[in-house]
Amino acid sequence: MFSAWDRRERPPEEGAAAGLQGFGVDKTFLSSLKGILLETELALTFIIFICFTASISAYMAAALLEFLITLAFLFLCATQYYQRFDRLNWPCLDFLRCLSAIVIFLVVSFAAVTSREGAAIAAFVFGIILVSVFAYDAFKIYRTELMPSTTEGDQQ
């Protein structure tokens, strides 16, 4: 087995993905249900970020943080780069991402609507829509990945 130092000195193997060529986008993922959910979450967080920037700039950090986290998950899933980190429980991380976004956007949306500005009210409406999208995503993750499977012996 080669050490990390030995791997750096060797030239790249023929046919091996080098540099950014290893980041090929899986277009089937982008058109799957999970890909569409991530794209919808990304678009809505960006809209909310713009609304908070126009009205209450104190809340824009929460939307920006969730935008960057969702963008990172979309990038990792679309390029299948997450498979290189096999020690992480990706379904659990994705589930926790959805739960934290639900809590953050519920709190921030209800806090923003108290200002009664037009952009803040729009951020509230988009925030509630986004919370429902995150809740559906969390439900799908739990249902397909995290829910313990029942066997015939467990049902009796």
Swiss-Prot record:
Q: Which residues form the MARVEL domain?
A: 29-146
Question: Which Pfam families does this one have?
Answer: MARVEL
**Family to which this protein belongs:** Belongs to the chemokine-like factor family.
State the UniProt keywords alphabetically: Chemotaxis, Cytokine, Membrane, Transmembrane, Transmembrane helix
Kindly indicate whether the keyword Transmembrane helix belongs to this entry.
Answer: yes
Q: Give the GO biological process terms.
A: chemotaxis; negative regulation of myoblast differentiation
* TM regions (residue ranges): 35-55, 56-76, 93-113, 119-139
Does this UniProt record's set of keywords contain Transcription? no
Subcellular location as annotated: Membrane
- Entry membrane topology: Multi-pass membrane protein
Q: Name one GO cellular component term.
A: membrane
GO MF annotation: an example: cytokine activity
Protein's UniProt name: CKLF-like MARVEL transmembrane domain-containing protein 5
